[in-house]
Amino acid sequence: MVVGIEGIITKKEPTFIIVKCASGLSYGIFISLFCSAKIQTQEKHEFFITQIIKEDSNKFYGFLDKDEQKMFEMLLKVNGVGANTAMAVCSSLDVNSFYKALSLGDESVLKKVPGIGPKSAKRIIVELSDTKTKLENVSDDKSEALAALLTLGFKQEKIISVLASAQATGTSELIKEALKKLG
């Protein structure tokens, strides 16, 4: 099972990239539009990978952010939601918007995602309702890091942008990584 890939992006389409690793192997990876907006060709990146093996395919789904990967994997557990629909949600909603819609039971937010109708939106809300508390805890680390960095005098827009691309988990690690990037 592949859980991570690091390498140079040699080809980029809106939701698909090819990454060439130091070993010489190249991998095709499906990504969200949010991920796509943060990367360029000829840049080196590390991706968290969710590998889906089926009888006729072996696909990699890549994420720069561990929270987005968790969201994708949770959506896959919902009856009737496949990888394409889960990736459409990841491309249409950022992690915080998804968590907020889930915690409020707001089906209208999910219905705006291409491929999700009223029944699917309701099913996602119902089946993931027991994970609401887990979701709220994931974003708490970033909220705490944001508050700490604001007290240090950094501008909110810059902090949010840095935290969105942060790879670290846990409040203290997020703050350390953000401080390095904020200078």
Swiss-Prot record:
SUPFAM superfamilies: DNA helicase RuvA subunit, C-terminal domain (SSF46929), Nucleic acid-binding proteins (SSF50249), RuvA domain 2-like (SSF47781). Pfam families: HHH_5, RuvA_C, RuvA_N. InterPro entries: DNA_helicase_Holl-junc_RuvA_I (IPR013849), Hlx-hairpin-Hlx_DNA-bd_motif (IPR003583), NA-bd_OB-fold (IPR012340), RuvA (IPR000085), RuvA_2-like (IPR010994), RuvA_C (IPR011114), RuvA_C_sf (IPR036267). One of its GO terms (cellular component) is Holliday junction resolvase complex. Residues 65-139 are annotated as: Domain II. Its main location: cytoplasm. It comes from the Bacteria. Transmembrane segments: none annotated. Keywords: Cytoplasm, DNA damage, DNA recombination, DNA repair, DNA-binding. Residues 139-183 are annotated as: Domain III. The keyword DNA-binding applies. It is found in: Cytoplasm. Residues 139 are annotated as: Flexible linker. The RuvA-RuvB-RuvC complex processes Holliday junction (HJ) DNA during genetic recombination and DNA repair, while the RuvA-RuvB complex plays an important role in the rescue of blocked DNA replication forks via replication fork reversal (RFR). RuvA specifically binds to HJ cruciform DNA, conferring on it an open structure. The RuvB hexamer acts as an ATP-dependent pump, pulling dsDNA into and through the RuvAB complex. HJ branch migration allows RuvC to scan DNA until it finds its consensus sequence, where it cleaves and resolves the cruciform DNA. Has three domains with a flexible linker between the domains II and III and assumes an 'L' shape. Domain III is highly mobile and contacts RuvB. This is Holliday junction branch migration complex subunit RuvA. It comes from Campylobacter jejuni subsp. jejuni serotype O:23/36 (strain 81-176). The gene is ruvA.
